A protein has these predicted regions:
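SAM-dependent transferase fold signal centered on methyltransferase-like domains
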Residues: 1-383
Length: 383
């Protein structure tokens, strides 16, 4: 639930008291109602807003002193993803960016002073952003021109009537309306948006294994497809980029099973760059329509499964018994199989852990029995 402007002002002015109150809460789901009652007793009519702020901050995804409500925190672009976009635009000599749907300012924290301006139609989010970031932020409609920024960023609504939007023309506002008003743009979309007809660059970004967004850049900023894989490492953030920079005859054809089965990062799959990644890593697909890859090594820093045997679906029970399988990770792609139901049906009684990948090769459904997931390291399978 969003805040009123009065509530935002109260939260800004009572930061120290709120921090003190938060430290005294139990902070568990079971104690939630008791915690809310305690905050209402202490802060009166502002207790609800204080409770929501403390709950929104509890995820730890954003700076601890920021103002946020539940929805804005949940919808916020992860700082690492925003930082990648800022770097991308900086590399293209963009001096000033206008974030048309800035919300509480998560994009802004990635930009240097004097290079970012934010606006939003929601007055309470504008007020929170003004507290959170040291950039100009004001209230404005995304379909109006209010600055001379070289590039505008927009994050149209991704749901309508509770359903996730998958078509560009259904976004609110639609990209066509944004492009009619502004020049070069970076339009943030859900990972599953259909970007096949986009004329510029479609950049799909994942962070620590989860696909976070597809960002559509206009033609002046780039073209083609790109997968960006961000991983948090002890030494910092690692960035891997896969682009559609190969000709068709340079891409590997589907082939037989190798030593390992590999499920590529979701950003690679969403960007349509499975074969490009395979070419770079010396891998190939088992089937041209299925994203699983195979080869004789694991790419460094990834994980996969060591192949044991192909098993006909009708002979799965016998195979499980033969390999003494007691626990089973089941992955499904290209087949209508419920992993939980299949696991119950197999009635595992063994003592070893295995992985079963149910997929399709050609017109047939197949089950690929593998060992448990293994991670590539310098001393393991990577060259």
């Amino acid at each position: 639930m969003s805040y009123t402007l009065d509530e935002v002002a109260f939260l800004r002015e009572n930061a120290a008291a709120i921090d003190t109150a938060a430290a005294d809460l139990e902070g568990t789901k079971k104690a939630h109602l008791r915690d809310v009652a305690k905050l209402q007793a202490h802060f009166g009519d502002y207790g609800r807003a204080v409770a929501e702020l403390i709950q929104a901050r509890s995820s730890g995804k954003l700076p601890g002193q920021w103002l946020m409500d539940h929805d804005s925190a949940q919808q916020a672009t992860p700082p690492a993803v925003a930082a990648y976009r800022a770097q991308f635009l900086q590399e293209r000599n963009v001096d000033l960016v206008h974030d048309l749907t800035c919300s509480i300012g998560t994009e802004g924290q990635a930009f240097a002073p004097g290079t970012y301006v934010g606006s939003d139609l929601d007055a309470s989010r504008v007020a929170m952003a003004q507290h959170n970031i040291e950039h100009p932020v004001f209230r404005a409609d995304a379909l109006t021109t209010t600055t001379t920024a070289q590039v505008c960023i927009a994050d149209p609504a991704r749901r309508q009537g509770g359903n996730r939007i998958t078509r560009l023309d259904q976004l609110l506002p639609p990209p066509a309306d944004l492009l009619a008003t502004h020049g070069e743009m970076a339009i943030k979309c859900a990972p599953g948006i259909d970007h096949s007809e986009w004329d510029g660059l479609a950049c799909v970004v994942s962070l620590d294994g989860g696909v976070k967004e597809t960002c559509l850049y206009t033609r002046g900023l780039g073209a083609g497809k790109r997968a960006v894989i961000l991983n948090t490492m002890p030494e910092g953030l690692h960035t891997d980029v896969i682009e559609d920079d190969l000709d068709e005859d340079e891409l590997p054809e589907a082939g037989p099973m190798g030593r390992f089965l590999i499920d590529p990062d979701g950003a690679i799959v969403r960007a349509g760059l499975v074969r490009h990644y395979a070419a770079r890593e010396g891998l190939h697909q088992l089937d041209p329509r299925i994203a699983y890859l195979t080869g004789d090594r694991l790419p460094h820093g990834t994980s996969g499964f060591e192949f044991i045997e192909m098993v006909p679906m009708k002979k799965l029970k016998a195979a499980m018994a033969a390999h003494d399988v007691g626990s089973l990770e089941i992955l499904v792609r290209g087949q209508d199989v419920n992993p939980d139901q299949l696991r119950k049906k197999l009635k595992l009684k063994g003592s070893t852990a295995k992985t079963l990948v149910v997929t399709r090769i050609g017109t047939k459904g197949v089950a690929v029995l593998c060992g448990p997931r293994v991670v590539s390291t310098e001393g393991n399978y990577a060259p």
